[in-house]
């Protein structure tokens, strides 16, 4: 993956392409976040723009690019890794959380002139984070503006979005109908009549569907709109391939609208509705859509699915315990095999051990995928908390 991102052009060339775009738009700076339109913790390749720009492969970071400077913030898990990967790139490492190091908002306010214009992709920043920048900027007359097309203009050879098929999650302990009943009750309690979800794990939980659009995360790229009358899933129709999925959607009265048509449909469908939106879990572009192109009234509040899916019933708790037992057994088998190899004088590599561990887990009943790539490190590599 890293080679795919980095071989065609240098970091300097990629940054210059972005600077050309910044200049064309009349901006003083550009903000890059490590996020996708669903604000996922782990990203599909299509949305790894920060990695493409910088060569930094950690899972968390943000960048600020001006006409003559480029800075990257990341937390202490990645300081050593970032220092290695940014060396010689001209990108300054900002150790987020270290004493005396300003965050991106503070740095922009301290280093840009009054009335400066800053741009970002509104799809990859939450509404609450966007507001925090606006509040900080307002004291100096600065403005943050969203531009959706910049990433495509700058990122040559950008990977296409994944079109992996969706499947029905059959090991569920609660029906879609029962979950929808709970969600609608919570939505009404919040003073709304509709709920728009963008967080992929919440959508997978509520629909009892799974996907594989993000490595180590069984989710699928989508939005979900729940009203008192209907449920609409915004997803690429090519992902719906099997009779089981089609039957599941029909049985649960879930309508499908193409992901590419979501903006127009959401704006029209929510006219006159009171829609509950979680400003920490919905991107700024969604908020702007409803405020500017729909007569919907936005009710700000936490999405009820976050709490509901965290409450496990007895059957689900037993499944969690069984998962831990199976994983523990896989680890025991792995360590036993490792002891045998070392006793026989074999010296496996980090990659070989990661593959061995995966293989032991994959043998277990009900295995779907790893929750994250195994972190196996020897020597100096062991100093990197998220080494891969």
Language-model segment annotations:
Residues 2-113, 125, 129-269, 330, ...:
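N-terminal accessory/capping or targeting/presequence segment of soluble
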Residues 108-109, 116, 120, 244-311, ...:
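Conserved catalytic alpha/beta cores of large enzymes that bind or transform nucleotide phosphates
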Residues 3-8, 119-126, 171-172, 202, ...:
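Conserved short loop/turn motifs at secondary-structure junctions
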Residues 132-157, 283-319:
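Terminal amphipathic helices with adjacent charged low-complexity linkers/tails
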Residues 24, 28-32, 350-372:
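Amphipathic alpha-helical
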């Amino acid at each position: 993956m890293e080679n795919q991102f980095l071989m065609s052009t240098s970091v300097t060339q990629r940054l210059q392409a972005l600077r050309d775009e910044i200049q064309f738009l009349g901006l003083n700076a550009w903000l890059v976040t490590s996020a996708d339109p669903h604000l996922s913790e782990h990203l599909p390749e299509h949305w790894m723009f920060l990695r493409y720009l910088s060569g930094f492969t950690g899972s968390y970071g943000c960048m600020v690019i001006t006409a003559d400077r480029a800075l990257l913030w990341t937390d202490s898990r990645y300081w050593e890794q970032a220092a290695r990967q940014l060396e010689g790139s001209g990108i300054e490492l900002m150790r987020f959380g270290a004493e005396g190091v300003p965050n991106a908002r503070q740095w922009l306010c301290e280093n840009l002139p009054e009335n400066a214009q800053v741009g970002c992709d509104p799809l990859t920043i939450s509404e609450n984070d966007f507001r925090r920048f606006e509040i900080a900027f307002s004291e100096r007359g600065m403005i943050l503006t969203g531009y959706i097309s910049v990433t495509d203009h700058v990122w040559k050879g950008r990977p296409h979005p994944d079109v992996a098929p969706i499947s029905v999650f059959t090991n569920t302990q609660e029906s879609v109908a029962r979950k929808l009943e709970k969600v609608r009750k919570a939505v009404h309690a919040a003073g709304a009549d509709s709920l728009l979800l963008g967080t992929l794990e919440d959508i997978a939980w509520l629909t009892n569907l799974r996907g594989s659009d993000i490595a180590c995360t069984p989710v699928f790229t989508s939005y979900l709109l729940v009203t008192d009358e209907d449920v609409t899933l915004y997803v690429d129709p090519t992902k719906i391939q099997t009779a089981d999925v089609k039957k599941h959607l029909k049985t649960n009265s879930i309508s499908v609208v193409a992901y590419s048509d979501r903006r127009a449909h959401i704006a029209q469908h929510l006219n006159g509705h009171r829609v509950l939106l979680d400003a920490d879990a919905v991107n700024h572009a969604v908020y702007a859509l409803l405020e500017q192109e729909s007569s919907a009234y936005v009710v700000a509040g936490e999405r009820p699915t976050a709490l509901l899916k965290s409450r496990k019933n007895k059957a689900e708790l037993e499944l969690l315990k069984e998962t831990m037992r199976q994983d523990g057994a896989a680890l025991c088998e792995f360590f036993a095999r490792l002891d045998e190899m070392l006793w026989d004088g074999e010296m496996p590599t980090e990659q070989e051990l990661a593959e061995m561990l995966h293989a032991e887990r994959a043998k277990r009943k009900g295995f779907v995928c790893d929750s994250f790539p195994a972190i196996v490190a020897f020597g100096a590599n062991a100093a990197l908390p998220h080494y891969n």
